[in-house]
Amino acid sequence: MKPQVGINGFGRIGRLVLRAAVASNSVNVVAVNDPFIDLEYMVYMFKYDSAHGRYKGDVKVDGGKLVIDSHRITVFQEMSASAVPWSQAGAEYIVESTGINTTVEKASAHFQGGAKKVIISAPSADSSHVRVGVNHEKYDPSMKVVSNASCTTNCLAPLAKVINDNFGIVEGLMTTVHSYTATQKVVDGPSKKAWRDGRTAAQNIVPASTGAAKRVGKVIPELNGKLTGMAFRVPTPNVSVVDLTCKLSKPATYDQIKAAVKRASESSALKRILEYTEDQVVSTDFLSTTCSSTFDARAGIALNDTFVKLIAWYDNEFGYSCRVVDLISYMFKRDH
């Protein structure tokens, strides 16, 4: 028995959650809702992907459904979350990937259509943040709406947990060198919130705000108030890298830190979530990787035994989407 899943919003994350779900075979996606993409266009958008390549299986329309290999998926085109008839397709676990319904109140609109649980694929101001491999044991079946946090929090949290558990983090600053996303501009345009966010993404390095480091405190309470960070949006289409610069409470050599991260990456708790490499890698080496965080042992440095800079890579699209699928699978097991 598998969780029956619906996806609301067929954008970057919605499509890649579907790819991850089909690949993992641990959940069954039975419905997709997007008011702006018709069925034929869904086939095209799922089949062809500029970052992750052409889908290697069979994608088609059959009997008014989106068919991916042997998976028959009902398609809705409702504007409002409350209007999506999820129960008609048997969908109970809803991935909210529009980027709009990110509060408990807004996400709860899905319950009107028969949803049982909602997983927000973005940070949320008021829902519980649950991260597989970091704080999944905090999930309780009474929780109806949960957030999988952001892709950057998903990269940072496993690394921060390992470092804090082994050496203690007094305080730290995070910088993510982040690929551009759909919120940025192809050419210079207006941006009321932050003017430089409106500059062309493919031509500039754009300093930007991010709450990813602060949100680590939501999944690791002992780090609450100890981390903050910022982003540089750079002209690459996918894959990003986190720089965690932190002060340790317990002195450690860089070799000891590497050993601790390597052990953690091989543990049952973090296997497939945190990986370790000593290869001389670059960003494209991580396209379509399924883990949340890959520690780059060669890239980090230490000023002394208590002040270090640690580097971790992540596919900010597909790696994140794989954790959404893992979270649904874990919730389903706990719920049943």
Swiss-Prot record:
Sequence positions that bind NAD(+):
R12, I13, D34, M79, N316
> According to its UniProt record, which reaction does this protein catalyse?
D-glyceraldehyde 3-phosphate + phosphate + NAD(+) = (2R)-3-phospho-glyceroyl phosphate + NADH + H(+)
Binding-site residues, D-glyceraldehyde 3-phosphate: S150, C151, T152, T181, T210, G211, R233
Q: In which pathway does it act?
A: Carbohydrate degradation; glycolysis; pyruvate from D-glyceraldehyde 3-phosphate: step 1/5
Q: Which residues form a coiled coil?
A: none
Q: Which UniProt keywords apply?
A: Cytoplasm, Glycolysis, NAD, Oxidoreductase
Q: Entry's InterPro entries?
A: GlycerAld/Erythrose_P_DH, GlycerAld_3-P_DH_AS, GlycerAld_3-P_DH_cat, GlycerAld_3-P_DH_NAD(P)-bd, Glyceraldehyde-3-P_DH_1, NAD(P)-bd_dom_sf
User: Where exactly are the transmembrane stretches of this chain?
Assistant: none
Q: Which domain of life is it from?
A: Eukaryota
Instruction: Tell me which species this is from.
Output: Echinococcus multilocularis (Fox tapeworm)
The record's subunit annotation is: Homotetramer.
Sequence similarity: Belongs to the glyceraldehyde-3-phosphate dehydrogenase family.
SMART domains (alphabetical)? Gp_dh_N
Question: Tell me, what is an example of a GO biological process annotation in this record?
Answer: glucose metabolic process
Q: What Enzyme Commission number(s) does the record list for this chain?
A: 1.2.1.12
> Mind telling me which residues the site (Activates thiol group during catalysis) is annotated on?
H178
Name of the featured protein: Glyceraldehyde-3-phosphate dehydrogenase
A single MF term (Gene Ontology): NADP binding
Q: What compartments host this protein?
A: Cytoplasm
Cite a GO CC annotation. cytosol
Catalytic residues as annotated in Swiss-Prot or TrEMBL: C151
A Pfam family that the UniProt record links to this protein: Gp_dh_C
